[in-house]
Amino acid sequence: VYDASGDIVTNDHVVGTDTQFKVTFADGRTLDATLVGADPADDLAVIKVAGTNLPAGAMFADSKQVKVGEICLAIGNPLGLASSVTDGIVSFNGRTVNEGNGVVLSSTIQTSAPINPGNSGGALVDLRGEVIGIPTLAATDPQLGGGAAGGIGFAIPSNTIKRIADQLVRTGQITNSGRAALGITAANANGPQGQPVGVLVHSVIAASAAAQAGISVGDVITQINGTPTPDVSALADLLAALYPNDQVKVAVTHPNGTTSSYDVTLGKLG
């Protein structure tokens, strides 16, 4: 519960394409709710309950102050087991993870608290009961056939939750994503043997960071700040860890085979 007005924050992948919901509270009441707004890029959504005498909103900690080693509790409905609580520690604060569906989450809190289907959209809290994150996904292990890797889960940090939820509650949409953007549409570029070699620029948005730096359609982005960008996913991972107005060096290969390095001041997504 985000506030006493009936706003509830959860994961975008939990609400999916639905706009109408049923919400069951701890006192046993089940009330109707509607979608307020969603932010797929950060995997967050807000729904609103219609009713009176609603619970007060949760208290949110400053996720930047969360320390590795702190004990934390994951609260949710794993495997349909309502109001379950699991414990663990904060394993890392500030991890960038790829959900595998085009969504790259930055600054996540990695935790050893077990995260199972049904935990998504719940709460990760500290021992003061303050929300430090929303459990969102667990790591998978290819050696386990894609099964969950025990003790490695990720939560969207409370500071991101507050920044995004405040905008959704206020306007139903995101007006300040806080995410860095180059201002291009792109696709994977492959070499003669099909190997990934970079990110092909399909289009450049007028007046965007890329346009102002001189990046053109047909260029292939190969590095950001010296880190290779073999494909779109790698580029997205790097951008997710950066912020608007950050200055970066972008290495490109032009259609004629020559190379250039551009100083780019990143723009803002959304």
Q: Where are the language model's segments positioned?
A:
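PDZ domains, with a preference for the canonical peptide-binding region formed by the helix
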Residues: 16, 223-251
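Conserved PDZ fold ligand-binding element
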Residues: 2, 8-9, 210-233
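Alpha-helix capping/termination and helix-coil
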Residues: 168-172, 208, 228, 243-246
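Extracellular and select intracellular beta-sandwich modules with Ser/Thr-enriched
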Residues: 260-262
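Serine-dependent protease modules
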Residues: 1-192, 206, 236, 255-258, ...
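A short, glycine/Asx- and small/polar-enriched loop/turn
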Residues: 195-196
